[in-house]
């Protein structure tokens, strides 16, 4: 049923898939992207590398290399965001992690080296990339959030220590 519904939306230039939780949805989204559509989706993850891993891990073991290759060939980027209580305690501030689908990033995905994406994000500021910890550090330094909240929302406390 889902693949039939996605077949109908192939007539559109931009496709929004609610959440990619299963192989059928992931496969249909990748096929749409391969045919030139801009496909956007959501996943509940704490970072870009975890997002890539979750997409691949949701697929049958025998299909994971193919999915990894497909994803690497169509990925434009991954944006992770979380809303964090602000320093004043009267609202929230968004912290982000941005991974851009550069040749180096896509090569790491293709080679199953997602654990190295963090270092590519750290060195990729010229193309708009940054890690969540880099953004948390910026928010602390600008007085927008306190250190306690930065540590609570960090996906790698040891790395955050290096930034702060």
Predicted regions and their residues:
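Hydrophobic alpha-helical segments typical of transmembrane helices
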Residues: 5, 51, 135-136
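Outer-membrane beta-barrel domain signature
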Residues: 8, 26-27, 163
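Conserved P-loop NTPase
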Residues: 74-164
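Single conserved hydrophobic/aromatic residue that forms the stacking wall/gate
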Residues: 1-10
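Conserved sugar-transfer catalytic core signal across GT-A, GT-B, and GT-C glycosyltransferases
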Residues: 5, 28, 150
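Conserved P-loop NTPase nucleotide-binding/switch module
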Residues: 12-83, 113
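Conserved ATPase "switch" residues in P-loop NTPase domains
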Residues: 8, 33-34, 140
């Amino acid at each position: 049923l889902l693949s039939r519904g996605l077949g109908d939306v192939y007539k559109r230039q931009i496709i929004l898939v609610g959440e990619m939780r299963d192989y059928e949805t992931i496969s249909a989204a990748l096929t749409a992207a391969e045919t030139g559509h801009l496909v956007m989706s959501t996943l509940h993850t704490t970072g870009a590398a975890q997002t890539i891993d979750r997409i691949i891990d949701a697929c049958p073991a025998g299909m994971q290399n193919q999915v990894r290759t497909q994803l690497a060939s169509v990925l434009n980027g991954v944006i992770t965001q979380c809303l964090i209580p602000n320093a004043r305690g009267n609202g929230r501030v968004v912290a982000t992690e941005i991974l851009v689908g550069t040749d180096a990033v896509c090569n790491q995905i293709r080679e199953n080296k997602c654990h190295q994406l963090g270092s590519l994000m750290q060195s990729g500021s010229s193309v708009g990339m940054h890690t969540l910890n880099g953004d948390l550090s910026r928010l602390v330094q600008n007085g927008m959030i306190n250190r306690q909240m930065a540590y609570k929302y960090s996906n790698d406390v040891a790395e955050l220590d290096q930034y702060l």
